[in-house]
Amino acid sequence: MFKLLGKPLIQHVIELLKEKGLENFVVVIGHGGEQIKEHFGDGSDLGVHIAYTIQKEALGMANALETAEALAEDHFFVVNADDLFEGSLIAEMAAKFKEGNADIVLSCKPVEETWKFGIITVKNGRVTNLVEKPLKGKETRNLAVIGVYLMSKRIFDYFRRVPVSDHQYEDAIQKFIEDKNNVSAVSYDGFFAGYKYPWDLFRMNTFLMDNTIKKPRIEDGVSISEKAKVEGNVWIRKGAKILDNACVNGPCYIGANTIIGNNCLVRGYASIGDNCIVGFTSEVKNSLIGDNCLFHMNYVGDSIISDGCLFGAGATTGNFRFDEKNIVLTIDGKKVDTGTNKLGAIVGDRSRAGINSSLAPGVRFGPYSIVGAGVNLQEDLEPGKMIFLDKKSNIVKDNGFTLSAEEKQKLTEVLKKYKQAK
């Protein structure tokens, strides 16, 4: 699980909900979910209770909720584990539920790209229609449903009444509306970000830093050289070391037992995990770095580097196109505009970039991939693959350079003077 400020995203969500008085959680897990279960256990470390259900196949949100039907109370919140928002939204939805005796409360906000969302119509305070991803040009409203719901247990009956599909969840809510049940909505204008693409993590990281690191936080056991410079709102965890001539310009986060080496620069919303070494003269700018990563004489800008990665000396991330246009990536065969002209590399777990390798803006590789020394990586590299330059034989020749006796004498005298000067 990738961490932001030392915690998995789902933990930030659980802690936010706990602050608003929610203590009982059901987490639906699927493939790879054991990692979540091992991390949280029964939730007692967080002061909550967590139960788990398993969704054996990825059959959509309605199916996921059906696995938890036996554990559901009469009314309950439904929250995506990878959505981040302000706690005020939960309070507003709870208040709406109490004041209007609603069966379901949806959260919504105005959007421009309406064809990407479920769009609702609201009349006299009640939701009268929900259309999932209306055709572009055919939409007549712009209020989009976002991923926080206050649901009635009666919704499970509606899941069973509509066919299984990608839109089963939304179709069931629409059926619930058509049957004249009371569905209300809260219009929300606060921060909201969903994790769909890797670069979505940058907005989340910025939000968390701005709201969590409001003043410098230097934990016990941190060693900061007198020759180092630490400025702004930084959070440095226990056991970390900031060596001579290093510069840390907040807002930044530096994990436990991480070393920021000599002459390094860490700046601009950089987040570095636990047990990392940012070696001599490296620069890390607005990047998200996992645990146990090693760097040496690197530039890492606007990049996402997962756990256990290693960058050899001189490996560099490019993060800006010469034409200054947005970075566009190919995702599942489709071109996707990232919405930013600053994006570096996206690197999966346990991957390596060899000495003097160059990583083009937005390039992706890993997990378990290797970019060889000197490679200029312009395209994505699949997981578990290696890429190297063609092996070319080195040419060995006589240098054809000889010194006369007089030249040798002059060189010897110069070397003697140099030695005496030292």
Regions found by a protein language model. Name each.
Residues 82-83, 228:
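Active-site metal-binding loops of divalent metal-dependent hydrolases
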Residues 163-166, 177-262:
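Extended, small-residue-rich solenoid/repeat segments and analogous flexible loops
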